[in-house]
Design a protein with these regions (language model features):
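N-terminal intrinsically disordered/low-complexity leader segments
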Residues: 1-19, 30, 89
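Amphipathic alpha-helical linker/stalk segments
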Residues: 12, 72-98, 130-136, 140-142
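Helix-turn-helix
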Residues: 23, 27, 31-65, 69
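Short hydrophobic clusters on alpha-helical segments that form packing/core surfaces
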Residues: 24-32, 74, 78, 103
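Short, hydrophobic secondary-structure boundary micro-motifs
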Residues: 41, 115-117, 125-126, 177, ...
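Helical hydrophobic small-molecule/effector-binding pocket
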Residues: 97-118, 126-131, 165
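Amphipathic alpha-helical packing segments from all-alpha helical-bundle domains
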Residues: 125-150, 155-163, 188-191
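Amphipathic C-terminal alpha-helical segment
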Residues: 146, 165-183
Length: 191
């Protein structure tokens, strides 16, 4: 198992019957580490995995299906990063702050994946179709409620959650768009 320069964990496995979908997702994440989502093609993905283009279409009927799967995988990785950061900080308020810093750092380490997750219409459709799926936003929002001392689901918890998410998401986007420098000290101070 390796970690690419953009912090997404990637298992190195050669393709064999039965795991082509997983291999396509892993290679798709690698491609996103190199290029923006718009330039990713199913044909290029097939070439890099070493399979024919038609075999890709058995798992992903179109580019949108692949992008949705990559966004879903990105959300899982972001949620895992946030959980790990919260646990490492000992939970509570320190853990909550750590989840925010993990969110921003994930965005900086995985800019194309982060933009795919949060700026494409795919994620809204994914969330509508998978409301029970745990994901990064759910983790951050639940921690915001706990940190604010509010009962989960209450108006106070919702307000705290939206404020927390807006802060870290806005900071991440400002840095990604070049409006602010990627400065660890600033991220630590704000989050």
């Amino acid at each position: 198992m390796t970690t690419n320069a953009n912090s997404v964990t990637i298992e190195k496995k050669s393709y064999h019957h039965g795991d082509l979908r997983a291999a396509l997702i892993v290679e798709g994440l690698r491609l996103l580490a190199e290029h923006e989502a718009d330039s990713l093609s199913l044909r290029e993905l097939a070439r890099r995995v070493g399979v024919s283009a038609p075999s890709v279409y058995r798992h992903f009927p179109d580019k949108e299906a692949l992008m949705t799967a990559l966004a879903e995988e990105g959300l899982k990785q972001l949620a895992a990063d946030q959980r790990e950061a919260s646990d490492a900080a000992g939970g509570g308020e320190a853990g909550f702050a750590a989840t925010g810093r993990a969110y921003v750092r994930f965005a900086l380490a995985n800019p194309a994946l982060f933009r795919l997750i949060f700026t494409s219409p795919l994620i809204a459709r994914y969330r509508r179709n998978n409301p029970e799926q745990p994901e990064a936003m759910t983790f951050l929002l639940a921690n915001a409620a706990a940190s604010a001392g509010a009962e989960q689901g209450s108006p106070e918890a919702r307000r705290a959650a939206i404020e927390a998410w807006a802060l870290v998401h806005g900071l991440a986007m400002l840095i990604l768009d070049g409006q602010l420098p990627a400065d660890d000290a600033m991220i630590d101070a704000i989050c």
